[in-house]
Every structure is written in structure tokens, then in C-alpha cells.
Amino acid sequence: MTTPEQRNRTRERYAYFRATKPILMVDFWNDGCLTQGCIAGGRKYFHVNARGDVEPCVFCHFASDNVKEKSLVEALNSPLFREFRSRQPFSENLFRNCPLIDHPEQGKEIALKFARYFTHEGAEEFFTELFPAIDAYSKAYGEIAEAAWKERMKRQDDKPLPAGKKVVGKHG
């Protein structure tokens, strides 16, 4: 996992390359400005793993349903997915859009209250043994991201758009 400083540098470099090169680059962690926050939980994206478990995101290894037992419509309307979507965006600062690494307390609460099972061996360790380190990471990156977000908001031509508006121009 990148350090908070490396993550910020990645965000800056992606913005530079998008502005200067004819290339499509996508970064789940840092592209909240392009998508108005996290796209997971069925808002614009979800993941079905090889066993058929319907996960909010490829990085969220917990589920309530399996496509072998329920339809996608039923899975996407489960309490897990409804709760996930109800909390989006997880922050007004769209540089901090992930419920796992930017707001781990929210990811933990969603997983432990609304998921029926973990989808990978050891996945629960993210919310137990690894949680203190992830929480510390989130706080350290949060300081960097807050400063970057305040700077972004100062730019008159780059205000956040209401949900549903098309994003055009600089994105970083």
C-alpha cells in the first residue's frame, strides 16, 4: 500500500497526465472528483467474485448474497447495498472517497452490521488486526487530502458539481 504522501503524489501526477497527455487513466482511490465520490455499492459499480458473491467493490471482501441464490436486483436491494449507497458520498472531500481506507470506521460498521459473511479467508482481519494501521493511514492521508481539497476549492473554475452533473475540465 502506498504511503499517504505517495498517494497524494499519484493524485497530482494523474491530474498532470490527464491535462497534458491523450490518455485515459483511472484511479479508484483518487478519482472521486470524476465520479462524485465512491462508485461502489451498486451506485455505479459492484463486484461479483468467481464464486458468485455480490460484493460492494472488488476491494470489499464481504457480501450478503450470491447470484446462485438470488438475482442481482435482489442483491443490490439488500440492506448491505442500500446502507452502502445511503452513506455516499462518504465525505465532502472527494479526495477521500473510500469507505475502507479513507473512512475505515464506516467500512467496518457497514461490513459488521450489514454483511452476512466475508468472501475471502482472512478478510475479517481488515476490521480487526489491520484496523489500527488502516485507521492511522486514514488520519495521516486525511491531513494531506484536506489541505489539497481546500486548495482545490479556492480555484474558481473547479468547484464540485452537484450529483448528476457532467464533469468536464481539470480533475485533480
Enumerate the predicted regions with their spans:
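Flexible mid-to-C-terminal extensions adjoining Fe-S/redox cofactors in radical SAM and related proteins
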Residues: 59-172
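Short glycine- and hydrophobic/aromatic-rich loop-to-beta-strand nucleating segment
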Residues: 46-47, 103
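Radical SAM enzyme [4Fe-4S]-AdoMet core and its adjacent flexible, acidic
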Residues: 1-41, 47-51, 55, 59-70, ...
